[in-house]
Amino acid sequence: MELPPDAIPTPMPTVIDANDFTPRLLALLSNSLVWRESQVLRRRFGLGTNDWRVISAIAIRPGITASEISEFIVVNKAIVSKSVGVLGDRRLIVQVEDTGRSRQLFLTPAGAEMHDAMLPISMRGQEIILADLSPEEVDRLNALLRRLLSRVRELQAEDTLEDLRGPGPV
């Protein structure tokens, strides 16, 4: 195979350590769980992981708005809006006009039934990854993950402030 003259055929001298780069490991774990869950949910219910997350958020916080779901599950509002449309079309949720433009979301009886049918699939993923950990290790892991999430939120707030300030000198 002949490479173009501007192709770099060797690894870069400074790269992440793929075996010890924590964000990569977290992403691999998350992606693996999401892929498995998505396959099962699509096959059994014709719904995906994002739809499940929206159903779950509404089950946890009845009356939540799409914007609040977006913040709660940390996904783009467009993804939530698409799921809200799908779930509404399937009569799994209803929207109730709130003040202004926002709408509160509630499960219907069919939505509550769907939640209860989907829940074991999500819980199975948790069982799989935590099977070899003691209850104390699970508690420690969850505490560490909550700390990491808190740091990420701080970083996002810093980035937002930086974006508001505009570009610096070039």
Q: What are the roles of these predicted feature ranges?
A:
Residues 24, 53, 139:
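Active-site phosphate/pyrophosphate-handling residues
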Residues 26-30, 34, 73, 115, ...:
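Amphipathic, non-transmembrane alpha-helical scaffold segments
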Residues 1-45, 170:
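N-terminal leader segment of winged-helix/HTH proteins
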